[in-house]
A protein has these predicted regions:
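Glycine/serine-rich anion-binding loops at beta->alpha junctions
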Residues: 39-77
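A short, flexible low-complexity segment enriched in Lys/Arg and Gly/Pro that occurs
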Residues: 17-55
Length: 194
């Protein structure tokens, strides 16, 4: 059969640079950002005594042996743990998701099924479901609300995932070869993005 979809959600123009920005935003917010070097005088070992007197030696004046100019000295403006996250506007995020959905639909990577209910939360049941539908390993199941049995059955499959429509994002849509959802999920996507 076929399902009617809103053209405003599933027939967007693909803006590659916007999609790239969205993916960069997602990956940047995942970064640990924990690069750090010794920063302050308090972080360093070594004497705080003045190596020689200020005047009269003919050498350059120096205050301590941990000056940044000296070997073994502290790092000036070195990296500190920080967040690399940045934001896109709501409109940009929406347009990027619409673009990827349209691209997936055009590439016939969308499968709509009546139900995604599994009786037992077992991996072999998820494999049987995927094999029965001829789905590739990289499959994303989009569900309108939490489906515990499906989530538990799929979580041990390395490349398949279950995602709530509320968590719909460009990265997950791009990473998976096939998107599987129900008419209820499509309705919820349309409500969210129209």
């Amino acid at each position: 059969g076929s399902v009617e979809v809103l053209s405003s959600v599933f027939e967007g123009k693909v803006n590659e640079s916007l999609v790239q920005r969205y993916v960069a935003m997602q990956l940047a917010s995942r970064r640990g950002g924990n690069a750090a070097t010794v920063q302050n005088k308090g972080d360093l070992h070594g004497s705080n005594a003045k190596p020689w007197r200020q005047k009269g030696t003919g050498r350059a004046r120096s205050g301590n042996t941990r000056s940044p100019i000296w070997r073994g000295g502290l790092t000036v403006f070195g990296p500190t743990p920080r967040s690399y996250a940045f934001q896109l506007s709501k409109k940009s995020k929406r347009l990027a998701i619409v673009a990827v959905l349209a691209d997936k639909l055009k590439a016939q990577s969308f499968t709509v099924v009546d139900s995604l209910n599994i009786e037992n939360p077992r991996t072999k049941d998820a494999i049987a479901l995927m094999d029965g539908m001829g789905l590739p390993a990289k499959t994303l199941f989009l569900v309108p609300e939490k489906n515990n049995n499906l989530q538990l059955a799929v979580r041990n499959l390395p490349r398949a995932d279950v995602l709530l429509v509320d968590g719909l994002n460009v990265f997950d849509l791009l990473v998976h070869e096939r998107i599987v959802c129900t008419p209820a999920a499509i309705k919820k996507i349309e409500e969210r993005l129209s």
